[in-house]
Amino acid sequence: MSSTYKDNHPYHHHPHHHHHHPKREPNENNSGILYTPSPSPSPPTLKVNKDSHVIKKPPSPSSFSSAAKPRHPVIIYTHTPRIIHTNPKDFMALVQKLTGMTHSDEDLGGGNAMTDPGVVKSINRTVSEPTVDRKNNRNRCGGGNNYLRNYSGAGNGKGIFFNNTMISEDSESSSVITTEENIGEHGQVNSSLPYSAVAIPPQPPPHPPPPPPPPSMYDAAGINYGAYLPTFPIFPPANPADNFLCGNQPFANFDDPLFFAPNMRSSFSSSSSSGFDGLTEFRDF
């Protein structure tokens, strides 16, 4: 009887028999949910294609612009650049010189301003070309030696005296002012301008001085009043159109020592820019 109990007891473990659980259906569990049976207890490992590593995500435009470095311009020299050393104060003058001159002038070097053709041409044009408007305007400004004369045109070799000071009218762009201090021992005028810059053509000889005053100009005491009065010419002017405002009369008698010093009556050098033949009178022709 005991053997029958052992065979029928479900928890009895026989040394020659395995433990048997109640058989269950594969799609059934305790909750009643059905699952698809898995083919293997663990999922298979993923394999990466050998060409997958070359595929990269393209960067965004914002990150591309920030990461890109600025490209510098490429300078290609057709000629070897020349290095010129100069001072900062001379930089602008050097730039104007290099940009305003031709290549042939640059090869000549710096030079001075007088050797440049443009400068010499402008100087010659200023000195040699006369103006179209040639007018003589005379204005008496008070008495004494205040005598104003405005002249425009090429030089005529005459001068004006203001209190023993001579102003030469030789050109519209050049003038020489001389006083008794810069006149040499032999009556030569020491001019500060070069001779070529103020050279003037030779002038015709002046007219002879007016005749002396008649004896009636002397009073009983022997004083010559004619020396202090203007002497009018006895001949008519060469051009009647010039006889206006003040006429063709001299300003005063130049024999009076009040106007000239003794060394001013001496001969002037021909190398002077004034071109005077003499200072015996002051007259317009």
From Swiss-Prot:
Composition-biased stretches (Basic residues): 11-23
Annotated region described as Disordered, given as residue ranges: 1-68, 195-218
Keyword Iron-sulfur attributed: no
Skewed-composition ranges (Pro residues): 201-216
Stretches with biased composition (Basic and acidic residues): 1-10
GO biological process terms on file: defense response; regulation of pollen tube growth
Subcellular localization(s) per the UniProt record: Nucleus
Gene Ontology cellular-component terms listed: nucleus
InterPro entries, alphabetized: VQ, VQ_8/17/18/20/21/25
Motif (VQ): 91-100
Signal peptide: none
Pfam families in UniProt: VQ (PF05678)
Key words, A-Z: Nucleus, Plant defense
Function: May function as negative regulator of plant defense.
Other remarks in the entry: Plants over-expressing VQ20 display enhanced disease symptoms after infection of either the necrotrophic fungal pathogen B.cinerea or the bacterial pathogen P.syringae.
Protein known as: VQ motif-containing protein 20
Lineage, uppermost ranks: Eukaryota, Viridiplantae, Streptophyta, Embryophyta, Tracheophyta
Gene from which this protein is expressed: VQ20
